[in-house]
Curated annotation (Swiss-Prot):
Pfam families listed in its UniProt record: F-actin_cap_A
Main localisation: cytoplasm
Keywords from the named record: Acetylation, Actin capping, Actin-binding, Cytoplasm, Cytoskeleton, Phosphoprotein
Protein name: F-actin-capping protein subunit alpha
Localization of this protein: Cytoplasm; Cytoplasm, Cytoskeleton, Actin patch; Cytoplasm, Cytoskeleton
One example GO MF annotation: actin filament binding
Role this protein plays: F-actin-capping proteins bind in a Ca(2+)-independent manner to the fast growing ends of actin filaments (barbed end) thereby blocking the exchange of subunits at these ends. Unlike other capping proteins (such as gelsolin and severin), these proteins do not sever actin filaments.
Self-association state and partner proteins as the record states: Component of the F-actin capping complex, composed of a heterodimer of an alpha and a beta subunit. Interacts with BSP1 (via C-terminus); leading to recruitment of the F-actin capping complex to actin cortical patches and the acomyosin contractile ring.
Length: 268
């Protein structure tokens, strides 16, 4: 296999990793491909972390890394005024230094004000581990990036979940665009992966945080309805006789016991 093809395969495997299980995927890949492939795998993990806006521990704070706060090989946090390197496997900040945020149009105070309002909303609405960020969009002087990441890892009960919502708000046109994505992986006596998402486009937005709250509440309600439909209709349509016991499965009780729908919606 050529080196480019090998890198492509490694990137595909890393990008398909379930939430909260990247370290296990890394360990398995090292066993399969040997230590000689370590740098290729770590490069793929770096790309995964940036694309998925993974939170990194920096001086006891959770800081989201993304393409919006990447500066060379480092990442900056404009609210806490630091710039840092990242150990992408351990998800920890290194070589942390002071950072002075400057922007042609957006002041640090504007970011801090939006940051604080967003914090209030998230404390009320996200019961899991939640991280968030407000970053200027490079080369787009009137645009701000807003990122929310919530994780709930429960390996003792064989499931992990991840919520990510990312938005771009234009201060001049008052337009808000973005995407919400969720993923849940359940792997006790099987392998069930659930993914859902929604594209967002809103105009005439004055209160950004209030609009985000409404959007995400509606998405959560739609998610509840889709789980109900999955439980009451889709899974029941799959009912069949088993070859050994020739008994029927009560799909309503079975899928209900997995708690995927309720826990994903409630962030448990």
């Amino acid at each position: 296999m050529s080196s480019s093809k090998f890198e492509e395969v490694i990137n595909k495997i890393i990008n398909d990793s379930p939430p909260g299980e990247l370290r296990e995927v890394y360990d398995d890949l090292i066993k399969i491909t040997s230590e000689n492939s370590k740098n290729t795998i770590l490069d793929a993990i770096e790309n995964y972390n940036v694309q998925n806006c993974i939170p990194i521990e920096v001086n006891g704070n959770s800081v989201i890394i993304s393409k919006y706060n990447k500066e060379g090989a480092k990442f900056f946090d404009p609210v806490n005024s630091v710039i840092f390197s990242v150990n992408h496997l351990e998800r920890k900040g290194l070589d942390i230094e002071p950072y002075e945020f400057t922007h042609a149009k957006i002041e640090k105070g504007q970011l801090k004000e939006l940051h604080d309002k967003l914090h209030e909303y998230l404390l009320q609405s996200f019961p899991g581990d939640v991280s968030f960020a407000v970053y200027p969009v490079p080369e787009e002087i009137s645009k701000i990036s807003i990122i929310i990441v919530s994780t709930k890892y429960n390996p003792n009960n064989f499931w992990n979940g991840h919520w990510r919502s990312s938005y771009i708000y234009d201060l001049e046109t008052r337009e808000l665009s973005g995407q919400i994505s969720t993923q849940v992986h359940y792997y006790e006596d099987g392998n069930v992966s659930f993914q859902s998402g929604k594209d967002i486009n809103q105009s005439n937005v004055d209160d950004v945080v209030c609009t985000i709250r409404d959007i995400e509440t509606n998405f959560e309600n739609d998610l509840d309805l889709s789980f109900f439909d999955l439980n009451e209709k889709q899974f029941k349509a799959l009912r069949r006789r088993l070859p050994v016991t020739r008994s029927k499965i009560n799909w309503g009780s079975a899928i209900g016991s997995y708690r995927l729908g309720k826990n994903a919606a409630e962030g448990k």
